[in-house]
Each structure stands twice: as C-alpha cells, then as structure tokens.
Amino acid sequence: MPLNLKNFIKNQALNSKMSDFQDLDHIDGASISAVCANLYNKPRDDLVMFYFRDGANYASVYTQSKIVSENIKWNLSIKSKKIKSLIVNTRNANAFTGPDGYKGLKEIAQEVSIQLSKKQVEDEDYPKRVLANEILFGCTGTIGEKYPTEKIKKHIPELIKKIKYVQNKPIWMKAALGIMTTDLKPKLAMEECKIGNTKVKIYGIAKGSGMIFPNMATTLGYIFTDADLSNDILSKLLKKNIDTTFNAITCDGDTSTNDMVSIFSTGKV
C-alpha cells in the first residue's frame, strides 16, 4: 500500500511532513513488514511485523492493570530466550475476548511459524524452524469486540512476502503509522552512541494518545538496537528507565489492559 500520511494522521496534524521526523535507517538483524489487513475497512496499514531472522534477545514490561488483554497473557507465557517475531495489530485490543481471543493468537502464531520457517528455508544457508513460542504479540484498539483471527491469518502470507531485510525511513514510518489508533501523528525516534569504540544504533516506535494513566496506559513502545546485550541487561535497562519515561506520562486519568514496552537486541554489533 502506498505511504500516504493522510490515511493515518488526524486533521489537527495534517501539516506533518516526512522531514519532521528523524531519519531512521537500517538495523542489522531486524526486518519490517506492514500491510492492510482491512481491520479498519479502509486503506491503511493495520498489521505490522518485526522479524529477527537470527533471533533477538529481549525484555518487556506490561500493564499494571489487574485485567489484561489476551496478548499480554500470551506474551507472559513465552519462556524462549530469543524472539523471532513481533506482530502488532490495531483496531482490536483482544481484551475481554476470553478463551477465543487467546486461541486466535495461538492459531496466528502457528501460521506465522509455518510461513517464517518456509522463508528460512528459502533465504538462509542454515535454516532454522521458527517456533510459535518465539513470537510476541501487540494488540491495540477497541476492547470487547471479537478478535479478527481469520482476517489476520489471511494476511500472514502477504505480511511475510513484504518483509524488508534492509530498512529505511519510509519503512520505519510505515511501521509507526501501522500501529496507530487515535494518535494524531506517528511516534518514532533514533539515537546513536558508542560502547567502547563501537557505534551502536537505538531506534524506537510507539503509539499512545488517550487513556495514558497510570504507567503507560494504552501505550505500545518498541525499541530496537544492534548492540550485543543479554536479556538480563536489557531487562535491567528497561526497568531502570521506565519510571522516568513511559511511566511518567499522564493524559486523561484512565488505564489500559494492553500496555507493552519491549526492547530487542539483534546482537549484530
């Protein structure tokens, strides 16, 4: 789908231009895809995949709500040391959907497992099977509606076909736009620094507009680095910084079932 900011950005921010945003480019080991799965019944990307062909170390923090969405339950059940894929859908929060919502995620993960394993065979010298328990989910949107499992499953082959191994600013922008719900504009940022004499990249995208209280409500944030950092270090870094960043935001006094901030390390530097 062509990248048209007007399909995503609200009227209050229609004067936004690509030049207003930082120039995120390539992070080795991370691949991106975004498609329209027709979750909104209009032409906009609403399903986004991040694919780590060699796996990525990771850490996450989640909502402090006692009631959580089905994707948070799924993510909390994952015990894999490395993650192969993160899939984010908009329009539907998969909250208050019960066993059917969780079952839907399992079906999607199994389909992604099959399709990405095929891609490994096609693209890699030493292919490895991608397992369903190496996949994380982010869901955001309306609470209490039936989860659109079949719509999402139907678009998994297209999502994988459109994976871009080399990223650039438009691809990162598609991902940032693709996870938006009521946001006025996309949220993406980058920083580069040195660890010793080695330059590393830290990129991130996020969404969140209303219901931001307390501690991240209705916020999704995804951070990516090519630095070689262990799960333990990533977890410590995330927990150390979350209180002065995502947990410091308040918007309208409501909380959410779906908060999620994750950091992924491809370990390529």
Question: Where in this protein do the model-derived segments appear?
Answer:
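N-terminal amphipathic/basic leader segments beginning at the initiator methionine
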Residues: 1-62
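Glycine-rich phosphate/pyrophosphate-binding loop regions near the starts of catalytic domains
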Residues: 50-107, 133, 138, 211-234
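Short, histidine-centered active-site or binding-site loop motifs used for metal coordination
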Residues: 90-92, 141, 206, 267
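Glycine-rich phosphate/diphosphate-binding loops and the adjacent beta-loop-alpha structural elements
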Residues: 91, 228, 259-269
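Short glycine/threonine-rich loop-to-helix capping motif typified by GTGT followed
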Residues: 99-101, 144-152, 265-269
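Glycine-rich, mobile lid/loop segments that gate access to catalytic sites or pores
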Residues: 106, 111-122, 126-246
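Glycine- and Gly-Pro-enriched alpha-helical subdomains that act as flexible
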Residues: 245-252, 265-269
